[in-house]
């Protein structure tokens, strides 16, 4: 009997999620076959190494940076796809010739929107780690997807999807979204004025890329996840509780109408949700070590300090507004986060910028009928955010 593997296309192959996904594929050749990779171009040597390890041809590789693409192409003996839309172009090319069964979108930021939409149009399952593309695209993106086509990779949303298997849609009472609290849990806003980019890059329980780590420190990441949960599970923002769980063992919970709460627990590793998303709805044996319940464990939960970390409440308000308002939240944060990393503004000012841009967002945000509406809203939000950052940086 011939074994049929799931063909996987990975976008963002050199990042934290992408490299772990490749490890899962390499460890499970009986389950997965890699049919292409895309990367930004900051690490062309790693792209070359990945392509060679999986015997990829140049046409199966995309690199956004032109110079890096040239280096990769020369090493692989051909021309690779390049340019700012390289990932989207790769999706369209692969899906037209040797279609992937699932596309893992692990790109960073809303630049992943085009690739998300291209994947949905192709009919492939979308294993989504690029939460920003869903937040920015909102209801427009969800309208392009058939039921069950988007499989979350975020550990929290993967946990929700797993817990939801325990009941029916009408039985769900509340969703509980857990947060580690980040490196500054327990700090006051005043204390955080002196935070450096190096401090913000040190997450207590997770190993992630720079932007995700910073977003976790401000709790913007948890705000994005709250918005994402309302879209993925078609639920109201007020039915989602956010609780701080520093141990990062419980990845999220579902409370049902009979008073039962189902939780998903596992050590803090992304390999389990990555493997599950690529092989959904089936689990991958040995994806990661399980918890050892013969040892003592202490799990704690506490409320979010909204005074010190207002990003979650901002996101809740944005989720209720819907339309392109979530795109404003994300775009303003991307600009403010970059400004902080460049030393132009202080740590608490990241969320201050997001909040102020949202206050005037009704002038340019609203219902999105197409991608152009989303991109126009993002562009205006970025412009306004940078104007504000310029004033703050003086």
UniProtKB/Swiss-Prot annotation:
InterPro entries, alphabetized: DXP_reductoisomerase, DXP_reductoisomerase_C, DXP_reductoisomerase_N, DXPR_C, DXPR_C_sf, NAD(P)-bd_dom_sf
Entries under Gene3D superfamilies matching the protein: 1.10.1740.10, NAD(P)-binding Rossmann-like Domain
Biological role stated in the UniProt entry: Catalyzes the NADPH-dependent rearrangement and reduction of 1-deoxy-D-xylulose-5-phosphate (DXP) to 2-C-methyl-D-erythritol 4-phosphate (MEP).
Binding site for NADPH: 14-17, 40, 43, 130, 132, 209
Coiled-coil regions listed: none
Domain of life: Bacteria
A Pfam family recorded for this sequence: DXP_reductoisom
Pathway: Isoprenoid biosynthesis; isopentenyl diphosphate biosynthesis via DXP pathway; isopentenyl diphosphate from 1-deoxy-D-xylulose 5-phosphate: step 1/6
Binding annotation for Mn(2+): 154, 156, 225
Protein name (Swiss-Prot/TrEMBL): 1-deoxy-D-xylulose 5-phosphate reductoisomerase
Native species: Corynebacterium efficiens (strain DSM 44549 / YS-314 / AJ 12310 / JCM 11189 / NBRC 100395)
A GO BP annotation: isopentenyl diphosphate biosynthetic process, methylerythritol 4-phosphate pathway involved in terpenoid biosynthetic process
NCBIfam families found in the cross-reference section: Dxr
Catalytic activity reported: 2-C-methyl-D-erythritol 4-phosphate + NADP(+) = 1-deoxy-D-xylulose 5-phosphate + NADPH + H(+)
Residues the record lists as binding 1-deoxy-D-xylulose 5-phosphate: 131, 155-156, 180, 203, 216, 221-222, 225
Cofactor needs: Mg(2+); Mn(2+)
Taxonomic placement: Bacteria, Bacillati, Actinomycetota, Actinomycetes, Mycobacteriales
GO molecular function, one term: manganese ion binding
């Amino acid at each position: 009997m011939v074994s049929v593997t799931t063909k996987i296309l990975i976008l963002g192959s050199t990042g934290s999620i992408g490299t772990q996904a490749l490890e899962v594929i390499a460890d499970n050749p009986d389950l997965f076959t890699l049919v292409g990779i895309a990367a930004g171009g900051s690490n062309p040597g790693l792209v070359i190494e990945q392509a060679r390890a999986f015997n990829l041809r140049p046409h199966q590789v995309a690199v956004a940076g032109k110079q890096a693409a040239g280096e990769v192409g020369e090493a692989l003996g051909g021309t690779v796809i390049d340019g700012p839309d390289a990932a989207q172009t790769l999706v369209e090319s692969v899906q037209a010739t040797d279609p992937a069964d699932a596309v893992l979108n692990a790109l960073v930021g809303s630049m992943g929107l085009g690739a998300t939409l291209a994947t949905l149009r192709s009919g492939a399952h979308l294993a989504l780690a690029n939460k920003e593309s869903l937040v920015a695209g909102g209801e427009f993106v969800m309208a392009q997807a058939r039921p069950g086509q988007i499989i979350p990779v975020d550990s929290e949303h993967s946990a929700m999807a797993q817990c939801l298997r325990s009941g029916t849609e009408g039985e769900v009472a509340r969703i509980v979204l857990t947060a580690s609290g980040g490196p500054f849990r327990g700090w006051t806003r005043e204390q955080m004025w002196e935070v450096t980019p190096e401090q913000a890059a040190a997450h207590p329980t997770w190993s992630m890329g720079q932007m995700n780590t910073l977003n976790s420190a401000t709790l913007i990441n948890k705000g994005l996840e709250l918005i994402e949960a309302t879209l993925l599970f078609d639920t109201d923002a007020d039915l989602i509780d956010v609780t701080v769980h520093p141990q990062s063992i419980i990845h999220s919970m579902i409370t049902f109408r009979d008073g039962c709460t189902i939780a998903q627990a596992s050590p803090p590793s992304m390999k389990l949700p990555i493997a599950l998303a690529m092989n959904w709805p089936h689990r991958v044996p040995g994806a990661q070590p399980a918890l050892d319940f013969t040892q003592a464990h202490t799990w704690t939960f506490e409320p979010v300090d909204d005074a010190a970390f207002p990003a979650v409440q901002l996101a809740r308000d944005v989720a209720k507004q819907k339309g392109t308002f979530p795109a404003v939240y994300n775009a303003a944060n991307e600009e403010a986060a970059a400004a902080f990393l460049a030393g132009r503004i202080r740590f608490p000012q990241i969320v201050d910028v997001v909040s102020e841009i949202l206050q005037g967002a009704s002038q340019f945000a609203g219902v999105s009928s197409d991608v152009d509406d989303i991109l126009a809203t993002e562009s205006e939000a970025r412009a306004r955010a940078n104007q504000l950052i310029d004033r703050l940086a003086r």
